[in-house]
Amino acid sequence: IFHAVSAFNNAGFSTNSDNLVPFVSDAWLLLPLAGALIGGGLGFPVWAELVRLVRRDRHVVHRISITARMTLAATAVLLVSGTVFFGCMEWTGLLSSMSLGGKLLNSFFASASPRTAGFNAIDYGQAHPITLMGTDILMFIGGGSAGTAGGIKVTTACVLLAAMAAEFTGRETTTIGHRSLPRSVTRQALALSFAGVMVVTLGVVALRFFDPEFSGDQVSFEVLSAFATVGLSTGITASLSAPSQIVLCLIMYLGRVGPTTLVAALAAKSV
């Protein structure tokens, strides 16, 4: 029960000192937990729309909102791409001793967990540096805008990609799914993303200053995990100096409260 609630709320807490590493080959545990943390990361508004869609009157046309569609599509893309990426990078590394099913299972779990709960069934301290970089990206993006996951949110990432596409193709408006987005939405996405990049950059600089003995890959992983309130680690957290740990605490607070506060403030000003 504890792990199920921890997964759905994207807390990532485990009653085991080594998290889910002892259950690395237990599909009956990892798959339900992955489903719970993905479900919690989608957010209740998305689930409410899906329920209404299932229960809809056949004579009434019901459309899923653009936010729900972005959340579902981006989640699916990130899960698939993350699974393929992790499998390719660690097939002969962390996954080398596992069966084919175990490799696929842990690649999928390693794709789902970093954006939300932060459970780990493998030792990230032994992961390839490129694997850590890919996981950094997943953590920074996060989950649904109304979900329990952290990060800048998948909807923000979708808006940024749409804005880039509009700029590259010379279009005046940003469109997603044949719908034009207000300029204020694009500005909010840019502001939120830039604020996130600034917090992460300053955090990495601070930790490298206080603890220069750790590699940039390790430090970046710790900072992004804190910013996205994921909780994954390469194993250096306990060895960090007190100033670095204080910096991580501040980053956790900013990562959890900052994006929501910024978007709410910008939205209030536009009313």
Q: Model-flagged regions — what are they?
A:
Residues 1-271:
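Membrane-proximal intracellular helices of multi-pass ion channels
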